[in-house]
Amino acid sequence: MGVTKKPDLNDPVLRAKLAKGMGHNYYGEPAWPNDLLYIFPVVILGTIACNVGLAVLEPSMIGEPADPFATPLEILPEWYFFPVFQILRTVPNKLLGVLLMASVPAGLLTVPFLENVNKFQNPFRRPVATTVFLVGTVVALWLGIGATLPIDKSLTLGLF
């Protein structure tokens, strides 16, 4: 059972806020039926209406039409698969490449056990998790940018 905080209606600060119309959710307002029946459907239907309106007013093509007689030299995946594509492209052994890809989520699953993250919310007080995040972001960007370059410049990004 959760502990509910009852408002102190004798508190002059709370009475002043309530008199001004503030403090609407100070002691809680039930999500049923107010939010779930009235606010959420309006937001969802409004989002759908905006998407449909933009699709009708400005239709865009999905991509270039396919030409089977003029294929590109190298077929690139979507941008979010660039780091994975770069790993598979640069590692000579395909089994090792697949194991490297599987080691990324396995390594991320070990991060919570390396330090007690339940105690602190501030990232500066969680150096291991912050370091893993920063190194992972830099490596993912490095691999993603390298996937768009030719294979001889892909690891150095043409800088060295």
Swiss-Prot record:
Top-level taxon? Eukaryota
Example GO CC term: the record gives: chloroplast thylakoid membrane
Q: Which GO terms describe its molecular function?
A: electron transporter, transferring electrons within cytochrome b6/f complex of photosystem II activity; electron transporter, transferring electrons within the cyclic electron transport pathway of photosynthesis activity; oxidoreductase activity
Q: Which UniProt keywords apply?
A: Chloroplast, Electron transport, Membrane, Photosynthesis, Plastid, Thylakoid, Transmembrane, Transmembrane helix, Transport
Q: How does the protein associate with the membrane? A: Multi-pass membrane protein
Q: Name one GO biological process term.
A: photosynthetic electron transport chain
Asked if the record carries the keyword Membrane, the reply is: yes
Compartments it resides in: Plastid, Chloroplast thylakoid membrane
**Membrane spanning segments where?**
36-56, 95-115, 131-151
Q: Which InterPro entries match?
A: Cyt_b/b6_C (IPR005798), Cyt_b/b6_C_sf (IPR036150), Cyt_b6/f_cplx_suIV (IPR005870), Cytochrome_b_C_euk/bac (IPR048260)
Query: Member of which family?
Result: Belongs to the cytochrome b family. PetD subfamily.
> What is the role of this chain?
Component of the cytochrome b6-f complex, which mediates electron transfer between photosystem II (PSII) and photosystem I (PSI), cyclic electron flow around PSI, and state transitions.
- Report quaternary structure and partners: The 4 large subunits of the cytochrome b6-f complex are cytochrome b6, subunit IV (17 kDa polypeptide, petD), cytochrome f and the Rieske protein, while the 4 small subunits are petG, petL, petM and petN. The complex functions as a dimer.
Q: Which NCBIfam families match?
A: cytb6_f_IV
User: What is the recorded name of this protein?
Assistant: Cytochrome b6-f complex subunit 4
What is the source species?
Spinacia oleracea
